[in-house]
Curated annotation (Swiss-Prot):
Taxonomic placement: Bacteria, Pseudomonadati, Pseudomonadota, Gammaproteobacteria, Alteromonadales
Function: Catalyzes the isomerization between 2-isopropylmalate and 3-isopropylmalate, via the formation of 2-isopropylmaleate.
Organism field: Shewanella sp. (strain MR-7)
Cofactors named for this entry: [4Fe-4S] cluster
Amino acids binding [4Fe-4S] cluster: C355, C415, C418
Annotated metabolic or biological route of this protein: Amino-acid biosynthesis; L-leucine biosynthesis; L-leucine from 3-methyl-2-oxobutanoate: step 2/4
PANTHER family from the UniProt entry: 3-ISOPROPYLMALATE DEHYDRATASE, HOMOACONITASE, MITOCHONDRIAL-RELATED
Subunit structure: Heterodimer of LeuC and LeuD.
Protein name: 3-isopropylmalate dehydratase large subunit
Length: 474
C-alpha cells in the first residue's frame, strides 16, 4: 500500500504510486516494480502456471493472487456440460492450477464469481495506491480507485506469479480534465467515448492518464470504472482517478478492505493520493461536460464516434488521406452511408454487459428505459450481470423482472458477447447496440457490426428497434 511521499517536489498521482512501488532500478534496464494484487482468469493463465511447474517454482505470494472464471463461461448454465471442449479444458485447468498453487478461486459455482474487473472491486481486492495487474487489456478499470492497474501478457503473468514483481518502463503522464457537469441522459460511457473521439484511439499511447474535473468527481465508483476501463481504447497504459470520499464509502466494509484501526490508517494514507499543486503533466486535454451528448460509435474502432443527434460522418470531409481511407473502410464494413442520421440506424441485437457496463448502476439505468415497454419485433436483447453479487442485487431490486417482462433475456454472469470467445456471439450481418468496449471488425462474431453505447442507449435501442436520443420521447 502506498504511503505519503516525503519529497517536496510536486508529483502527480501516478508518480506517487509508481515511486512507492519501485524496488530496483538496474543500470541500463527497466525498473522493477512490486505488484500488490494479481488477478487471473482461465484464458491467459494456463501457460503461465505450466511454466512454473516445468521450472519447479512456487508462487511468491499466493495470498495476493485471485482467480475467477469469466471469459469462456456460459451465461445460460453454470454446468460444465454447457461449455465447449476448449472452454471446459480452460476452466478445469484453472481450477487444478489454483488447487496446486494455493490460489483463491471464484469458480462458476461461487456466489461471487464474475468478470474479473467487476468482482475485484466489489470484494475490496482493489484498493487505492496499489499496483494491480491481470492478463487482460481492460485491467485499467481498477484505476478508478487510484490504483495503478494495467494488463500484462502471459509471460509476464508467469513472472508475477513467481516473483510478485514486474519490469516496467515509467510512462509519460496525461491529464484529461472534464470541466463542469453533464446534462440529463449523459453517462460515464458517453464521457469516455467523447474523450476517445477527441484524442483518437492512439492519443494516449505511452501515457498513464489521470481523469479529473468536476464531471469525473461527480461520478459514482461504477461510473469512474467505466471511464478508466476504456483508457486502453485511447492507447493509454492505464487510467486513474484520485480517491476521495466516494471511493472510501464504496470500499468500507468490503471483504478484503482494511478493517477497524487499519481502515482509519488506510484512509489517512489514501487521502494523500492526489496530484500535488504544481505537478506537471506531459500532456493535458480539456473537455466541457456540457458539450457532451449521448454518444455512439459509427465505425470499427472506439474513436469513430459521434453524438446521437449527428449524422454518419462523410469521409470526403476528412483532409488527412490516411484517416479518410480508414473511414471509408469502416463504413464499407459497418454497412452505413455517410449523412445518414444515427437515429435512422436499425439494430437487431442488443448486449448489455461486459466489464465496462455490467454493474448495478448500469442495470438500473437500462431497466429505467425498459420498464413498462417491450423489446421491438425482430430484436434479440440480452442482459448479463457482471458478477454474482450484481445479479443478486439486481434480482433483489426486481430489475430482472423488468427486463424479462420487457422481452430481454436475463443471463448468468460472464464476459459474454463482449468478445466472440464463448457461445454468446453475433452472426454475420447482425447489427448490435453494445455496452462493451470494442467495436473492431469481428469482435462480437465474424461479420458482426457493433455500435458502442451506454446501457440506457442500448436498452432504448432494443425498445425502438433503432438508435434513439434518450433525451427525447420515443
Amino acid at each position: 500500500m502506498t504511503t505519503p511521499s516525503t519529497s517536496t517536489t510536486p508529483k502527480t498521482l501516478y508518480q506517487k504510486v509508481w515511486d512507492a512501488h519501485v524496488v530496483a532500478t538496474p543500470e541500463g534496464e527497466a525498473p522493477i516494480i512490486y505488484v500488490d494484487r494479481h488477478l487471473v482468469h482461465e484464458v491467459t493463465s494456463p501457460q503461465a502456471f505450466s511454466g512454473l511447474k516445468v521450472a519447479g517454482r512456487k508462487l511468491r505470494a499466493p495470498e495476493k493472487t485471485f482467480a475467477t472464471m469469466d471469459h469462456n463461461t456460459s451465461t445460460r448454465s453454470a454446468s460444465l456440460d454447457a461449455l465447449s471442449p476448449m472452454a471446459r479444458t480452460q476452466v478445469e485447468t484453472l481450477a487444478q492450477n489454483c488447487k496446486d498453487f494455493g490460489v483463491r478461486l471464484y469458480d462458476i459455482h461461487h456466489p461471487n464469481q464474475g468478470i474479473v474487473h467487476v468482482m475485484g472491486p466489489e470484494l475490496g481486492i482493489t484498493l487505492p495506491g496499489t499496483v494491480i495487474v491481470c492478463g487482460d487489456s481492460h485491467t485499467a478499470t481498477h484505476g478508478a480507485f487510484g490504483a495503478l492497474a494495467f494488463g500484462i501478457g502471459t509471460s509476464e503473468v508467469e513472472h508475477v506469479l513467481a516473483t510478485q514483481t514486474l519490469r516496467q518502463l515509467k510512462a509519460k503522464t496525461m491529464k484529461i480534465e472534464v470541466r463542469g457537469q453533464v446534462t440529463d441522459g449523459v453517462t460515464a460511457k458517453d464521457i469516455v467515448l467523447a474523450i476517445i473521439g477527441k484524442i483518437g484511439m492512439d492519443g494516449g499511447t505511452g501515457y498513464v492518464v489521470e481523469f479529473c474535473g468536476e464531471a469525473i468527481e461527480a461520478l459514482s465508483m461504477e461510473g469512474r470504472m467505466t471511464v478508466c476501463n476504456m483508457a486502453i481504447e485511447m492507447g493509454a497504459k492505464a487510467g486513474m482517478v484520485a480517491p476521495d470520499q466516494t471511493t472510501f464509502d464504496y470500499l468500507e466494509g468490503r471483504e478484503f478492505a482494511p478493517k477497524g484501526e487499519d481502515w482509519a490508517e488506510a484512509v489517512a494514507a489514501w487521502k494523500a493520493l492526489k496530484t500535488d499543486v504544481g505537478a506537471e503533466f506531459d500532456a493535458t486535454v480539456v473537455l466541457d461536460a456540457a458539450d457532451i451528448a449521448p454518444q455512439l460509435t459509427w465505425g470499427t474502432n472506439p474513436g469513430q464516434v459521434v453524438a446521437i443527434d449527428a449524422p454518419v460522418p462523410n469521409p470526403a470531409d476528412e483532409a488527412n488521406p490516411t484517416i479518410r481511407a480508414s473511414m471509408e473502410k469502416a463504413l464499407d464494413y459497418i454497412g452505413l452511408t455517410a449523412g445518414t442520421p444515427m437515429t435512422d440506424v436499425a439494430i437487431n441485437k442488443v448486449f448489455i454487459g461486459s466489464c465496462t457496463n455490467s454493474r448495478i448502476e448500469d442495470l438500473r439505468s437500462a431497466a429505467k428505459q425498459a420498464k413498462g415497454r417491450k423489446v421491438a419485433s425482430g430484436v434479440t436483447a440480452i442482459v448479463v450481470p457482471g458478477s454474482g453479487q450484481v445479479k443478486a442485487q439486481a434480482e433483489a431490486e426486481g430489475l430482472d423482472k423488468i427486463f424479462i417482462e420487457a422481452g430481454f433475456e436475463w443471463r448468468l454472469p460472464g464476459c459474454s458477447m463482449c468478445l466472440a470467445m464463448n457461445d454468446d456471439r453475433l452472426e454475420a450481418g447482425d447489427r448490435c447496440a453494445s455496452t462493451s468496449n470494442r467495436n473492431f471488425e469481428g469482435r462480437q462474431g465474424r461479420g458482426s457490426r457493433t455500435h458502442l453505447v451506454s446501457p440506457a442507449m442500448a436498452a432504448a435501442a432494443a425498445i425502438a428497434g433503432h438508435f434513439v436520443d434518450i433525451r427525447k420521447p420515443y
